[in-house]
């Protein structure tokens, strides 16, 4: 399902090269994911700088629209590290190499990985993260961000019954984390944590600091890319 890599490129921070190759991208979308034709046309015909600014407003403000998959499953749990290692091992099996700036659970990267698998395995991989895709799509749709269409398209390609509309009730009950007040609260919390960490750094070993960091963590459900996911 090579179209998954194209969808991943449309999901990433807008890149000049994609704008230069917009006719090729549109041709692939029309052929393999026609439900995204309007989205792709509107995206790639808009000024690049405008879309870059809009992308940052959508995906860089708060965690609830993060494109890091495990942010929505493990958050800061210690299980997140092992999940990263497991996913990285899956990438290495198909020859996918990451550079030092990439995290294995970055959704466009995961889509690139799925794009080299047989179609049935690629669909299974999408189904394994279908609840996350639906939730992200629902949050983006609530914020009137056009990228929600990408998540609905992925769910359609996977054959999932979920969509951005299927999580409307949950999304409406959530407190948004992209408001000025929410962002200020996160900043203040990080400042307090920074001060506390520095206060104990002189008389604590790295191991003790690590244990304190995770002492209150819980272990959320793991998104297993090798098992069947929600439909």
From Swiss-Prot:
One of its GO terms (molecular function) is unfolded protein binding. Keywords: Chaperone, Cytoplasm, Nitrate assimilation. It comes from the Bacteria. Its main location: cytoplasm. It is found in: Cytoplasm. It holds the Pfam family Nitrate_red_del. One of its GO terms (biological process) is nitrate assimilation. GO terms for cellular component: cytoplasm. Coiled coil: none annotated. Belongs to the NarJ/NarW family. Chaperone required for proper molybdenum cofactor insertion and final assembly of the membrane-bound respiratory nitrate reductase 2. NCBIfam families: narJ, PRK15054.1. This is Probable nitrate reductase molybdenum cofactor assembly chaperone NarW. The lineage of its organism: Bacteria, Pseudomonadati, Pseudomonadota, Gammaproteobacteria, Enterobacterales.
């Amino acid at each position: 399902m090579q179209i998954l890599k194209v969808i991943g490129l449309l999901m990433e921070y807008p890149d000049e090269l994609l704008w230069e190759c917009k006719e090729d991208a549109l041709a692939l979308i029309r052929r393999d994911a026609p439900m995204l034709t309007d989205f792709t046309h509107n995206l790639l015909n808009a000024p690049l700088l405008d879309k870059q600014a809009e992308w940052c407003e959508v995906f860089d403000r708060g965690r609830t629209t993060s494109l890091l998959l495990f942010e929505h499953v493990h958050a800061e749990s210690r299980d997140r590290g092992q999940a990263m290692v497991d996913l990285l091992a899956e990438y290495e099996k198909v020859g996918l190499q990451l550079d030092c700036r990439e995290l294995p659970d970055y959704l466009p990267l995961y889509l690139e990985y799925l794009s080299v698998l047989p179609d049935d395995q690629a669909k299974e991989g999408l189904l394994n993260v279908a609840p996350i895709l639906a939730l992200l799509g629902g949050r983006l749709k609530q914020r009137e961000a056009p990228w929600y269409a990408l998540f609905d398209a992925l769910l359609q390609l996977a054959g999932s019954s979920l969509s951005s509309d299927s999580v409307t009730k949950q999304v409406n009950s959530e407190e948004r984390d992209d408001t000025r007040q929410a962002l200020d609260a996160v900043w203040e919390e990080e400042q307090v944590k920074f001060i506390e960490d520095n206060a104990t750094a002189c008389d604590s070993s790295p191991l003790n600091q690590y244990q304190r960091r995770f002492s209150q963590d819980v272990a959320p459900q793991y998104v297993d890319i090798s098992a069947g996911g929600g439909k």
